[in-house]
């Protein structure tokens, strides 16, 4: 016997429903009962049991509309949850099947994701979700360390160059792996552990172009110019990387932004959370350099990518 439908719920909705079972066997199923089980906190099961009575061989029957569940208000529209349906009858038949709960329909003000690992990206417009971020700029140019990085764009640099490797004051779990060191690049990204490529041409993520694993806050060909600097600050609560008054190589637009790595573990599988903030955001590089193929990439790339470069979320790359 197998269920042949999915249950659709809106975030925060409580609903009673029946489940249709098809008896694909050759024997009559007598006194069929079922129980829904899940360990997810996204779904509260108010009444987990229902019955189908007798289902003849080759027939289909609905349960008595006794199942009752409540979807969490934090569940992301468009996502789904697979729960277990335990089925038994008085003849000794027992089987566990999957039952699919689908939550809402994706709208503009819903987070991006999930990727295959389970990450979502929430932005400040996702106000219907408790996890939506609020802008709270933490200025570190006066309290942090100036990494004294230098980059004149288009792969040219001098002095200390475009990369710095720094130790984190805590282990940061990213895609299930603990890291205690990051590589910071002037071109608007960080990678975990040692990376020796400045990757000034931005590409879609996930993908083979660029470092991995990475967090791209504003991956583009960026220059330090006369006033651009990259700062680093950390304490027991977070590590902050701030790109301050950087300039795009293509259009000389000003960019100031920061990545905050939080010392927490409130994401799926105990991973740490990430916050990206923009004080000055001008996504103006169109990627059309008349004299120098190939293109540098249209606009900036924003998102995350795992260590195999085969999973991630791309928030922006027009």
Please state what every model-predicted region is.
Residues 14-16, 60-66, 96-98, 238-240, ...:
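Intrinsic-disorder/low-complexity, polar/charged segments enriched in Ser/Thr/Lys/Arg/Asp/Glu/Gln
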Residues 71-73, 102-318:
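Extracytoplasmic Ser/Thr/Pro-rich, glycosylation-prone low-complexity segments
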Residues 22-43, 48:
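Short acidic, flexible loop segments centered on an aromatic residue
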Residues 11-27:
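Short beta-strand elements of extracellular/lumenal beta-sandwich folds
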Residues 32, 64-106:
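Terminal connector regions
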Residues 44-75:
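Intrinsically disordered, low-complexity Pro/Gly/Ser/Thr-rich segments with frequent PxxP/GP/PP motifs
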Residues 1-12:
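Low-complexity, acidic Ser/Thr/Pro/Gly-rich terminal tails and inter-domain linkers that flank the onset
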């Amino acid at each position: 016997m197998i269920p042949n439908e999915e249950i659709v719920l809106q975030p925060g909705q409580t609903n009673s429903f029946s489940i249709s079972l098809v008896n694909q066997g050759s024997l009559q199923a007598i006194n069929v009962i079922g129980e829904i089980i899940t360990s997810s906190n996204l779904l509260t099961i108010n009444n987990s049991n229902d019955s189908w009575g007798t289902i003849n061989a080759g027939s289909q029957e609905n349960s008595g509309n006794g199942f009752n569940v409540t979807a969490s208000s934090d569940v992301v529209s468009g996502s789904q949850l697979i729960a277990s349906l335990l089925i038994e009858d008085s003849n000794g038949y027992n089987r566990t099947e999957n039952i699919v709960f689908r939550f809402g329909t994706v709208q503009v003000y819903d987070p991006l994701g999930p990727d295959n690992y389970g990450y979502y990206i929430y932005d400040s417009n996702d106000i219907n979700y408790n996890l939506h971020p609020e802008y709270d700029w933490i200025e570190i140019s006066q309290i942090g360390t100036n990494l004294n990085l230098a980059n004149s764009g288009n792969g040219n640099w001098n002095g200390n160059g475009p990369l710095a490797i720094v130790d984190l004051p805590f282990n940061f779990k990213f895609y299930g792996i603990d890291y205690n060191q990051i590589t910071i690049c002037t071109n608007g990204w960080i990678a975990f552990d040692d990376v020796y490529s400045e990757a000034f041409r931005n590409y879609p993520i996930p993908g083979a172009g660029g470092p991995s694993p990475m967090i791209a806050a504003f991956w583009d060909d960026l220059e330090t110019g006369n006033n651009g600097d990259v700062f680093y600050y950390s304490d027991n609560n977070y590590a902050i990387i701030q790109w301050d008054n950087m300039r795009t190589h293509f259009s000389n637009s000003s960019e100031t932004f920061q990545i905050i790595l939080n010392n927490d573990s409130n994401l799926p599988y105990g991973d740490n959370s990430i916050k990206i903030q923009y004080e000055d955001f001008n996504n103006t590089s169109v990627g059309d350099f008349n004299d120098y193929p190939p293109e540098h990439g249209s606009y900036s790339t924003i998102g995350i990518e795992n260590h195999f470069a085969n999973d991630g979320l791309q928030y922006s790359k027009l």
